[in-house]
């Protein structure tokens, strides 16, 4: 039976379809019947299903040809999701969803888009694909909320991870799909059929058409779908996807790849949008996230292995191809950002090989791939790069060998090889062929590539430093072969290899470097020289024995190479000379040999300064003697000169080079070699004196001087006549007026020769004590020597400065070695004349400095060689009197000369400097003593050191230092230590820096000289003098000069002594006052000590010794010294830095004493002295940088707090220093809070946060606050999850700071602004707070919260919401709650109730912005709360709304419910019965335009509309609840609420159009109860509601139902209200009563007219009566009200006119008369009302019906009417009045016609009407004209 019914129903549907003629009809039928018809497919009866199929076929034909017909998609989607539906039904349903969805308007598609997503869950893959195909085009048109909150999104995807994944995969395929791609299926079908039986189809899918790059066949097929998109549509789809991702609808992490692929799109719009989005997210994306990187690799490479993880073979149609080159070019730059990408093996190497050698690669991709190789080399960790190395190297070498087109690319490849070698040297060590290949490439490649090869080779050097045996020999040969290549870069790299690959004592490589040192190009020879001249062992403590080749071996090697080269074309020709090497290389060779010689002799090998080299001559001499005596010979190689001793070979090489090219260093080396062992070596040059003379004639002054010395050494080996002739020849050459150069050379040679002769003579005398044997030869020789000396003397007054200086030098050399062979006094050239002449030159401004220096030296030498020198004191006095200002160097020379002259023959100046060192020298036993040191000391101490002239004092100090240094063992010096100390102390307070430094050095020396008792006395005197500032007694007039301003030494506190006071206090603090001397020795910061003169004092050695003695005090010293290095006083800073550099040689010392240093600095940060505070800040700034501070984490809070205090210092420079220290401290702390630091990081955070939050952020100092916040933000970024335990303290503190740190002026402005301005301003303030760094930090913390932290955080948060001060704080709290609901919803559930009750306080905040924020938060919070909490909240809100009269409560209810509806729609649906009735009531709130009620109404309306299935459906659904709430509203004490309830009731009645019991009774009872009592504002709404309900439910009211008011009761109540005095209310009451009477057709006209008619009459009287005394405005208002009443009254009379003959009989005449009177007298508005009432009156007048005829009565009424209506017909002004009058006449004529009562219309009436109608013939409105003419014609016809 049921089946028959089903079929019948289907037949009827068929029939309806057949009858449907228009699209609209068809659409209506489909909308109504399609879903149920589809459900019939689940029928078990074949017949029914068949019928359905028939119907669907018919339907499909009709639908397809009519694209505009809409299908009931929404209903179909609901049906599709029904879990109970059978698959047959769902399969057909989706067909119509697919057909209907694209036809929908775009807005509707957007609305249904979320439903499509929901519908997908658990459905078969093809159907899911179809739904996504429908969804994707819609995304372009979707509107997303501005706030990117997950719960606010239209797609609530957070709970649908599977759907998200499906969607993302599909989107990826859409983005990969190229425009205009066509899937050629036909070909695939043919192929697949033929391939079915064959097993050879091995996964390649030969039967499957080629999918687009990056896609599988299946992916392409599903994107194309049933209705392929056009290119334009596809572009829109792609843009929609980008928009979707932009709106953060899916997790950012998941969508990164999509943006990367979209950014490679061929259409500009898509690529640009994706690029912009990628850029904006750049900082948020973690490129080291394996999930992101693996996805990129997968898309880039496609499915390379055909096996899935489980080992099953991947189906060919699912196999993805690699992406196109265009996409690859976008992916690789992102891989370059990622450390993870570099580590992911094997994908990294696959990408490299694909980019370099793939089939579709291009030069751009190759370049990027090479960059990726660089990236791997730099970032890949050691363990992970090992397996990659060989593959990378193979790839790179292959590229280098095969790819030659692009030089830039090749350059990158070579660079990559270099980087790889520095990471993995073991790969390269064995492969010398690769080096050769690169060297060859360097020779042949393009210039732009060479630089990269050069760089690569330079990096590779390190890989070959461990070569041995054959490999090393091979490398030697390789380097040698490339050192002679024409390309400069090749030679440069070869030098690098020679210097780095081999050890520094490797002879063949040194030889190669020596050859390179002769290279014409600076970059080659400069590098070679740098390596060769690098002094070994200077900075190393270990033995230097293996760091240079041994001298003999090196000499033999060079000799062998030289002799070989002489036989080959590589020899060098210069003039007539042939050299084995070019001059530059040869020069470097001999210098290097000299360095090897020095090294082998055990001294520091230097080649920079000849004077330094000469200091080592005695040691070298000893070594040479050893070599000569050991008889060491060369190996049996060919040796042209036959010399086999290395020294002889060395001298031979020097001779060869000197003869060919010359050069000062070569000359020196030869001179040195011969001078140190003249007896053996000089004799060989006796026969070469002419050659030596030629060297003496050189154009260079220094060369002549050295040659003259050389000549004197050679000559000194001869004697007798040979010597005589040589000296005579020299005298002759000197006197001959040759060129000045020849004279100069001869003059020097003469002096040196005579000097050596005298020295020899003196030595013989002391040795033999036997003068007799040589007596016979003496007179002759003495005469010759005297002649020579006089000859030299004659040149002293030469006009040539050159010759004068030479004469001076020569005389000095003679005087140093023996008594001058000239008279002491008298006329002519005497010793007195000579002394006076030389002394006169010192102050002379005509003389050069060189002349002055030589004159002083010479004077100092006279008493040295002559024990009986008569003018010793004269000479000394002269030297001491010749002080000149600012000639410091000269004073050091004078000091030296005074020292030599004072001690006379015992001076070290008398020694042979080539053979004896200063330390080794002892004066000859028989020398006469001429010591005048006591006298000199007395003159200096008692005359010069206390001179009023500061220059004299400075000079005296330098002389005194010289005396103490050089004569430290002299008894006179030792016995005057206190006086000398006193003298030095007096100079300490000089304003001149050098004077201070000299004095401090002197003090150190004095202390070292004393015995224990002396030292104690010296220390106490010094400390007393320094610390008390007691002046030195003999400095009488010094006071005025000592502290004169402007000199270097002046310190900020105006005391020259401040540096020394600090040193003294430093020593005293250590309880070791004597250490002050050590400090003074170390405080060596004047440049003077680095000069030749200064260095001679040997203070470096003293300083080293002092450093060693101070070592035990380092723990106490290091902290103080560290701080002193940053002292603002320059003098102190330099002195202390000097001491520091001397003491702290080990870099780790600071780390060792870190705690002590820190303790000292923190203590001194708050010192009373600003200088100390500033230096402590600066020192702290330096200390904290770049060192691990794990051990001092506990100290950090103290440092922060102290620096915060100093940041507010009174002195600006201290404040700046503190700011600098704080910035550094901040950076260091941020680094320490990195998760990589582990437990140390945790400890740091725990230590820092309380300090930064309580002290920093709450500081009154702006800078401190700013820095604290900045630091917190950075810490939160770097610390990550480590912040979790501290969140309960950190988050509330930061929330408080949002208000504390806001400028207070904003609060002031907010208070003064209007409501509208205030809201806008507060909104902007809250927005600024939310984007502030503090909020940024809070958001960072929130990521890591969970249940372990919430228990502590929530109570604090609640407290802050309730008692927090300030807009920012409260708004921030709300924002935090919102974030918590999304970050940890499950964990939050137990605490939601507490948070809700806290937020309730915010809901009633007077500030609308805070109120909105709290409502917004509450809207999110209900999602995580328990049902019981939510119910309590809703009850609370309900209570507020119904009971509280303040607008603030109503607003908060609207905002909260709206927020719940928007952000937690599911919660609202679950509690719809509580919420929606309230929303319905809220919708009907009576809006006050000035207030925000209009906005609230809109919010309520939105809640209602979004949660009910149409308003009618909603009312039906919640009728019970709606009535309950409206009843409650009506019973409210508030008039406004009563009125609101009434409006809501009226709305229910209107929209339902009929109410059934018992609801009708409930509503009416409630309304009638509300009517009782006095009139109140808004009571009118009750009346309107009653009228609405009665009108809508009149039929139901006819029935008698218990508890339902009867019609009679309703009328009684309403009529009662009509009698109320309030006219405005009365108008509504009368209108309501009329509506009720009309609806119920009740006859209550008597009562009604008794109320209304008197008022109409009264109104007429008043309006025609006398004006009242009220003011004009009130009058106007009253008139308007009366007019309104009149209109209403007439309208009501018309409506209330009953269908009762008796009543009509009683009132018809009166009513007609009343209307006619008003028609004649009133304004047009009243006339119009009266006419409308008249129309209703005649419409219901029973006299005009045949059965109730009364001709007489009717005639009377008609006459009355016709007389008055003519006024209206003839009203020319208002056409509306004419129109209404015509309708009345038309109605009358019609009624008379129907009742056949024409006779009642008398002729008088007709005439009146015809005349009036005639006036309308020219009417302006044609329709009226026409109607009037028609009626006139009708009337005329009656006659």
Curated annotation (Swiss-Prot):
The modification Phosphothreonine is found at residue 830. Adapter/scaffolding protein that binds to the 26S proteasome, motor proteins and other compartment specific proteins. May couple the proteasome to different compartments including endosome, endoplasmic reticulum and centrosome. May play a role in ERAD and other enhanced proteolysis. Promotes proteasome dissociation under oxidative stress. Keywords: Cytoplasm, Cytoplasmic vesicle, Cytoskeleton, Endoplasmic reticulum, Endosome, Isopeptide bond, Nucleus, Phosphoprotein, Proteasome, Repeat, Ubl conjugation. The keyword tRNA processing does not apply. GO terms for biological process: ERAD pathway; proteasome assembly. GO terms for molecular function: molecular adaptor activity. GO terms for cellular component: centrosome; endocytic vesicle; endoplasmic reticulum; endoplasmic reticulum-Golgi intermediate compartment; multivesicular body; nucleus; proteasome complex. This is Proteasome adapter and scaffold protein ECM29. It comes from the Eukaryota. It holds the Pfam family ARM_ECM29. Non-stoichiometric component of the proteasome; associates with the 26S proteasome. Interacts (via N-terminus) with VPS11, VPS26A, VPS36, RAB11FIP4 and RABEP1. Interacts (via C-terminus) with DCTN1, DCTN2, KIF5B, MYH7, MYH10, MYO10 and ARF6. Residues 187-211 are annotated as: Disordered. Residues 187-201 have a biased composition (Low complexity). HEAT repeats lie at residues 28-65, 107-144, 162-205, 326-362, 387-426, 429-466, 469-507, 683-720, 721-759, 783-820, 829-868, 870-907, 931-969, 975-1012, 1013-1050, 1112-1149, 1152-1189, 1194-1231, 1243-1281, 1285-1323, 1348-1386, 1390-1427, 1517-1554, 1558-1595, 1605-1642, 1646-1683, 1779-1822. PANTHER family: PROTEASOME ADAPTER AND SCAFFOLD PROTEIN ECM29, TRANSLATIONAL ACTIVATOR GCN1-RELATED. It is found in: Endoplasmic reticulum; Endoplasmic reticulum-Golgi intermediate compartment; Endosome; Cytoplasm, Cytoskeleton, Microtubule organizing center, Centrosome. Belongs to the ECM29 family. Its main location: endoplasmic reticulum. InterPro entries: ARM-like (IPR011989), ARM-type_fold (IPR016024), ARM_ECM29 (IPR055444), Ecm29_N (IPR024372), HEAT_ECM29 (IPR055443). The modification Phosphoserine is found at residue 824. There is a cross-link at residue 1033 (Glycyl lysine isopeptide (Lys-Gly) (interchain with G-Cter in SUMO1)).
């Amino acid at each position: 039976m049921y089946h028959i019914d089903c079929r019948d129903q289907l037949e009827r549907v068929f029939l309806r379809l057949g009858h449907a003629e228009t699209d609209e009809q068809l659409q209506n039928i489909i909308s109504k019947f399609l879903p149920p018809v589809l459900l019939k497919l689940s029928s078990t009866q074949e017949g029914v299903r068949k019928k359905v199929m028939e119907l669907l076929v018919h339907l499909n034909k009709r639908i397809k040809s009519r694209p505009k017909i809409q299908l009931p998609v929404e209903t179909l989607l609901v049906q599709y999701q029904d879990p109970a539906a059978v698959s047959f039904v769902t399969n057909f349903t989706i067909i119509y969803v697919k057909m209907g969805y694209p036809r929908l308007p775009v807005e509707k598609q957007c609305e249904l888009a979320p439903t499509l997503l929901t519908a997908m869950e658990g459905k078969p893959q093809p159907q899911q694909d179809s739904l996504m195909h429908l969804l994707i085009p819609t995304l372009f048109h979707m509107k997303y909320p501005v706030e990117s909150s997950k719960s606010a999104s239209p797609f609530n995807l957070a709970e649908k991870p599977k759907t998200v994944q499906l969607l993302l995969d599909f989107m990826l395929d859409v983005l990969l799909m190229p425009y205009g791609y066509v899937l050629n299926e036909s070909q695939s079908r043919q192929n697949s059929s033929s391939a079915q039986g064959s097993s050879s189809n091995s996964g390649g899918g030969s039967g499957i058409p080629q999918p687009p790059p990056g896609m599988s066949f299946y992916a392409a097929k599903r994107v194309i779908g049933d209705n392929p998109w056009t290119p334009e549509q596809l572009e829109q789809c792609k843009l929609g996807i980008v928009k979707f991702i932009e709106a953060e609808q899916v997790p950012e992490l998941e969508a990164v790849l999509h943006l990367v692929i979209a950014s490679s799109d061929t259409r500009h719009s898509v690529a640009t949008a994706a690029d912009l989005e990628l850029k904006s997210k750049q900082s948020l994306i973690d490129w080291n996230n394996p999930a992101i990187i693996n996805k990129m690799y997968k898309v880039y490479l496609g499915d390379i292995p055909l096996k899935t993880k489980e080992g099953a073979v991947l189906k060919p149609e699912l196999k993805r191809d690699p992406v196109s080159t265009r996409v690859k070019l976008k992916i690789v730059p992102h891989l370059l950002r990622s450390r993870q990408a570099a580590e992911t093996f094997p994908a990294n190497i696959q990408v490299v090989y694909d980019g370099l050698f793939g089939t579709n690669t291009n030069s751009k991709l190759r370049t990027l791939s090479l960059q990726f190789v660089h990236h791997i080399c730099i970032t890949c960790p050691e363990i992970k790069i090992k397996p990659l190395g060989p593959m990378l190297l193979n790839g790179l070498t292959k590229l280098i060998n095969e790819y030659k087109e692009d030089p830039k690319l090749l350059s990158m490849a070579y660079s990559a090889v270099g980087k790889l070698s520095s990471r993995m040297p073991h790969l390269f060590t064995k492969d010398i062929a690769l080096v050769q290949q690169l060297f060859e490439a360097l020779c042949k490649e393009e210039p732009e590539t060479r630089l990269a090869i050069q760089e690569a080779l330079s990096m590779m050097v390190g890989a070959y430093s461990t070569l041995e045996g054959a490999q090393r020999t091979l490398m030697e040969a390789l380097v040698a072969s490339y050192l002679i290549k024409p390309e400069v870069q090749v030679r440069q790299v070869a030098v690098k290899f020679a210097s780095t690959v081999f050890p520094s004592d490797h002879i063949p490589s040194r030889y190669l470097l020596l050859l390179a040192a002769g290279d014409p190009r600076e970059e080659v020879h400069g590098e070679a020289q740098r390596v060769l001249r690098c002094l070994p062992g200077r900075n190393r403590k270990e033995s230097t024995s293996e760091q240079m080749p041994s001298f003999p071996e090196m000499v033999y090697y060079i000799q062998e190479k030289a002799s070989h080269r002489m036989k080959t074309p590589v020899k060098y020709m210069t003039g007539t000379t042939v050299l084995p090497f070019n001059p530059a290389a040869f020069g470097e060779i001999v210098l290097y040999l000299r360095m090897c010689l020095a090294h082998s002799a055990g001294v520091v090998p230097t080649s920079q300064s000849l004077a330094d080299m000469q200091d080592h001559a005695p040691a070298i001499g000893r070594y040479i003697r050893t070599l000569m005596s050991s008889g060491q010979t060369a190996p049996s190689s060919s040796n042209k000169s036959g010399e086999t001793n290395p020294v002889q070979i060395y001298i031979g090489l020097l001779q060869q080079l000197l003869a060919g090219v010359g050069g000062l260093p070569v000359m020196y080396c030869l001179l040195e070699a011969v001078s140190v062992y003249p007896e053996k070596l000089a004799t060989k040059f006796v026969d070469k004196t002419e050659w030596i003379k030629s060297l003496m004639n050189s154009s260079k002054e220094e060369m002549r001087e050295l040659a003259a010395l050389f000549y004197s050494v050679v000559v000194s080996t001869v004697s007798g006549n040979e010597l005589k002739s040589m000296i005579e020849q020299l005298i002759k050459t000197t006197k001959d007026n040759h060129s000045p150069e020849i004279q100069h050379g001869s003059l020097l040679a003469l002096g040196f020769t005579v000097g050596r002769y005298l020295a020899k003579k003196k030595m013989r005398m002391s040795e033999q004590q036997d003068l007799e044997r040589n007596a016979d030869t003496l007179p002759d020789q003495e005469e010759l020597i005297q002649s020579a000396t006089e000859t030299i003397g004659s040149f002293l007054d030469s006009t040539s400065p050159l010759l004068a200086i030479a004469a001076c030098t020569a005389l000095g050399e003679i005087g140093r070695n023996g008594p001058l062979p000239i008279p002491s006094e008298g006329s002519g050239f005497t010793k007195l004349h000579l002394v006076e002449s030389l002394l006169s030159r010192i102050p002379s401004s005509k003389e050069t400095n060189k002349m002055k220096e030589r004159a002083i030296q010479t004077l100092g030498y006279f008493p040295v060689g002559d024990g009986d020198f008569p003018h010793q004191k004269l000479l000394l006095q002269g030297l001491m009197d010749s002080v000149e200002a600012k000639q410091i160097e000269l004073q050091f020379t004078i000091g030296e000369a005074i020292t030599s002259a004072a001690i006379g023959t015992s001076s070290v100046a008398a020694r042979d400097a080539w053979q004896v060192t200063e330390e080794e020298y002892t004066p000859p036993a028989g020398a006469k003593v001429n010591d005048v040191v006591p006298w000199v000391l007395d003159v200096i101490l008692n005359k010069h050191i206390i001179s009023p002239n500061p220059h004299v004092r400075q000079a005296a100090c330098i002389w005194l230092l010289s005396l103490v240094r050089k004569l430290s063992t002299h008894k006179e010096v030792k016995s005057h230590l206190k006086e000398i100390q006193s003298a030095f102390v007096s100079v300490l307070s000089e304003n001149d820096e050098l004077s201070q430094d000299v004095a401090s050095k002197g003090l150190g020396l004095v202390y070292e000289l004393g015995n224990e008792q002396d030292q104690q006395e010296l220390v106490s005197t010094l400390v007393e003098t320094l610390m008390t500032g007691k002046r030195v007694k003999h400095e009488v007039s010094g006071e005025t000069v000592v502290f004169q301003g402007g000199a270097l030494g002046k310190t900020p506190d105006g005391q020259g002594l401040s540096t020394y006071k600090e040193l003294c206090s430093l020593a005293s603090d250590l309880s070791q006052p004597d250490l002050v001397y050590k400090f003074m020795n170390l405080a060596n910061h004047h440049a003077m000590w680095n000069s030749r003169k200064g260095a001679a004092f040997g203070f470096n050695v003293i300083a080293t010794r002092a450093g060693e003695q101070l070592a035990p005090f380092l723990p106490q010293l290091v902290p103080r010294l560290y701080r002193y290095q940053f002292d603002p006083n320059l003098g102190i800073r330099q002195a202390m830095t000097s001491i520091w550099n001397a003491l702290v040689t080990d870099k780790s010392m600071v780390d060792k004493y870190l705690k002590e240093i820190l303790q000292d600095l923190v203590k001194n940060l708050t010192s009373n002295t600003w200088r100390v505070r500033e230096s402590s800040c600066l020192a702290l700034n330096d200390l904290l940088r770049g060192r691990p501070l794990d051990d001092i984490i506990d100290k950090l809070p103290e440092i922060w707090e102290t620096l915060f205090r100093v940041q507010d210092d009174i002195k600006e420079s201290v404040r700046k220093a503190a700011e600098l220290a704080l910035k550094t401290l901040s950076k260091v702390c941020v680094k320490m809070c990195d998760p990589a630091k582990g437990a140390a990081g945790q400890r740091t955070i725990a230590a820092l946060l309380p300090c930064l939050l309580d002290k920093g952020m709450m500081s009154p100092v702006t800078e401190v606050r700013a820095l604290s916040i900045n630091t917190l933000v950075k810490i939160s970024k770097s610390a990550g999850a480590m912040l979790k335990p501290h969140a309960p303290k950190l988050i509330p503190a930061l929330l408080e700071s949002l208000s504390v740190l806001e400028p207070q002026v904003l609060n002031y402005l907010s208070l003064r602004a209007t409501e509208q301005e205030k809201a806008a301003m507060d909104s902007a303030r809250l927005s600024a707070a939310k984007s502030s760094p503090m909020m940024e930090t809070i958001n960072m913390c929130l990521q890591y919260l969970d249940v372990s932290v919430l228990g502590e955080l929530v109570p604090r948060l609640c407290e802050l919401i309730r008692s927090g001060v300030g807009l920012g704080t409260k708004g921030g709290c709300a924002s935090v709650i919102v974030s918590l609901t999304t970050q940890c919803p499950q964990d939050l559930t137990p605490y939601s109730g507490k948070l809700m009750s806290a937020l309730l306080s915010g809901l009633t905040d007077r500030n609308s912005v805070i109120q909105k924020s709290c409502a917004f938060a509450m809207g999110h919070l209900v999602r995580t709360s328990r049902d019981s909490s939510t119910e309590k909240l809703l009850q609370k809100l309900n209570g507020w709304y119904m009971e509280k009269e303040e607008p603030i409560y109503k607003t908060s209810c609207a905002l909260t419910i709206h927020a719940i509806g928007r952000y937690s729609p599911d919660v609202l649906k679950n509690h719809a019965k509580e919420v929606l009735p309230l929303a319905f009531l809220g919708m009907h709130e009576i809006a006050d335009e000035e207030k925000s009620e209009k906005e609230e109404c809109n919010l309520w309306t939105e809640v209602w509309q979004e949660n009910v299935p149409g308003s009618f459906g909603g009312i039906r659904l919640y009728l019970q609840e709606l009535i309950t709430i409206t009843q409650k509203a009506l019973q409210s004490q508030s008039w406004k609420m009563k009125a609101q309830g009434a409006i809501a009731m009226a709305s229910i009645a209107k929209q339902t159009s009929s109410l059934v019991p018992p609801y009708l009774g409930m509503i009416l009872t409630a309304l009638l109860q509300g009517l009782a009592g006095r009139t109140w504002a808004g009571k009118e709404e009750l009346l309107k509601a009653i009228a609405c309900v009665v009108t809508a439910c009149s039929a139901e009211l006819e029935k008698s139902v218990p508890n339902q008011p009867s019609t009679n009761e309703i009328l009684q109540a309403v009529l009662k209200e009509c009698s109320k005095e309030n006219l405005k209310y009365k108008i509504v009451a009368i209108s309501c009563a009329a509506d009720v009477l009309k609806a119920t057709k009740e006859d209550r006209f008597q009562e009604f007219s008794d109320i209304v008619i008197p008022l109409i009459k009264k109104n007429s009287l008043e309006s025609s009566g006398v004006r009242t005394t009220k003011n004009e405005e009130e009058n106007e208002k009253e008139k308007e009200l009366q007019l309104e009443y009149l209109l209403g009254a007439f309208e009501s009379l018309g409506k209330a006119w009953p269908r009762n003959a008796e009543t009509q009989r009683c009132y018809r005449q009166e009513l007609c008369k009343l209307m006619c009177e008003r028609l004649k007298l009133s304004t047009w508005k009243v006339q119009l009302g009266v006419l409308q009432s008249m129309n209703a009156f005649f419409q219901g007048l029973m006299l005009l019906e045949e059965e109730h005829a009364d001709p007489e009565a009717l005639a009377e009424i008609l006459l009355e009417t016709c007389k008055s209506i003519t006024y209206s017909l003839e009203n020319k002004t208002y056409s509306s009045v004419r129109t209404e009058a015509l309708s009345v006449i038309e109605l009358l004529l019609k009624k008379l016609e129907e009742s056949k009562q024409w006779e009642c219309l008398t002729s008088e009436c007709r005439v009146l009407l015809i005349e009036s109608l005639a006036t309308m013939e020219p009417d302006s409105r044609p329709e009226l004209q026409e109607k009037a003419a028609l009626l006139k014609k009708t009337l005329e016809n009656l006659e």
